[in-house]
Amino acid sequence: EELPIGSIVYKNQYLKGSYNENCYYVRIEKKRKDDNYWLKPKGLYGTILHEGFYDTIHESVCKLLDFIEKEGYQVIGDMYEYEIHNHFTSQDIYKYLIQISIPVEKR
């Protein structure tokens, strides 16, 4: 079962090679009536699945950034890390699965 939690790393931070989380989020199924939450912006995202422990996440981020550049896109926002499997769902740290998404636009 997937977990409804994730983290956000600010653009100015991950572009400098720092991948520490700036804030966390919880996924919700449908829009709420109050304004006490923030929605992930709609749009085109470059995405990669990172399998492994957190200390190797930079390898996947670098692959994704290289791919985005190679395909003629540029990053335009913060990076989202959505934890599909982590210490709550896997006893093997090398089986952690994190979806990394970065909003992009064509150059």
Regions found by a protein language model. Give the residues of each.
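A solvent-exposed interaction/effector surface
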Residues: 1-107
